[in-house]
UniProtKB/Swiss-Prot annotation:
Residues annotated for phosphate binding in this entry: 86, 124-126
Organism superkingdom: Bacteria
The protein's enzyme class: transferase
Reaction(s) catalysed by this chain's protein: tRNA(n+1) + phosphate = tRNA(n) + a ribonucleoside 5'-diphosphate
GO MF, any single term: tRNA binding
Subunit field text: Homohexameric ring arranged as a trimer of dimers.
Family matches, as SUPFAM superfamilies: Ribonuclease PH domain 2-like, Ribosomal protein S5 domain 2-like
Protein name, as recorded: Ribonuclease PH
EC number per UniProt: 2.7.7.56
Similarity-based family: Belongs to the RNase PH family.
Swiss-Prot/TrEMBL keywords: Nucleotidyltransferase, RNA-binding, rRNA processing, Transferase, tRNA processing, tRNA-binding
CDD domains reported in the protein's UniProt record: RNase_PH_bact (cd11362)
Length: 237
């Protein structure tokens, strides 16, 4: 039995609130249960130096957690003077995932900067961030088209992400913190709206997992992501 009494395949309630802030071209508050992440997408002219003159754009991401997003206060990374390895890993994951969804040639020499700030953490912050950032990205691209900056929509497909894992010997979907901290296997999966895989991050925290367990986890993720994409589409309609 899961602590929340959810079934193994059941995700937490997912809520996507668009236009959450006034200034960003795209802004979303995404909630996976008690995990809440603010995702903004800023449209900027120009590209990093390594892309100048190549006629293509760039999508990059930054990620952070507010000091009291967790049970006890954590020091701001700015105050420490450096980002943790975890932060760098997550923001690279978000950027890679979103770049897979965008035709960089159609974006032109423009950059979209995604900022994901965790307001409250209860497991699955990176998967929530990817899911919300995708919707913010769509709004930023639509803003650019409305301004005449882009003639064609560079978005190839929606993407979403969910965590899966083995908890007390059973494969489950969308782990909250109490499950994540005790899971024998922990995995984050990013997929397109058609179920194609963009990224898998999987680790055996305790006992190694079998090929059969891997396949069952991927099926759980595919089912969960399909439901999340439906919520993304409903929020954009």
């Amino acid at each position: 039995m899961r602590p929340s009494n959810r079934t193994p395949a059941q995700s937490r309630p997912v809520t996507i609130t668009r236009q959450f802030t006034a200034h960003a071209e795209g802004s979303v508050l995404v909630e996976f249960g008690d995990t809440k992440v603010l995702c903004t997408a800023s449209f900027e002219e120009g590209v990093p130096r390594f892309l100048k003159g190549q006629g293509q754009g760039w999508v990059t991401a930054e990620y952070g957690m507010l000091p009291r997003s967790t049970h006890s206060r954590m020091q701001r990374e700015a105050a420490r003077g450096k980002q943790s390895g975890r932060t760098q890993e997550i923001q690279r994951l978000i950027g890679r995932s979103l770049r897979a969804a965008v035709d960089m040639k159609l974006l032109g020499e423009n950059t979209i900067v995604i900022d994901c700030d965790v307001i409250q953490a209860d497991g699955g912050t990176r998967t929530a961030a990817i899911t919300g950032a995708c919707v913010a990205l769509v709004d930023a691209l639509n803003w650019a088209r409305g301004k005449g900056i882009l003639k064609t929509n560079p978005l190839k497909f929606l993407i979403a992400a969910v965590s899966v894992g083995i908890y007390k010997g059973e494969p489950i979907c969308d782990l909250e913190y109490i499950e994540d901290s005790a899971a024998e296997t922990d995995m984050n999966v990013v997929m397109t709206e058609t179920g194609k895989i963009i990224e898998i991050q999987g680790t055996a925290e305790g006992e190694p997992f079998s090929h059969e367990e891997l396949l069952s986890l991927l099926e759980l993720a595919k089912h969960g992501i399909r439901e999340i994409v439906d919520i993304q589409k409903a929020s954009l309609s």
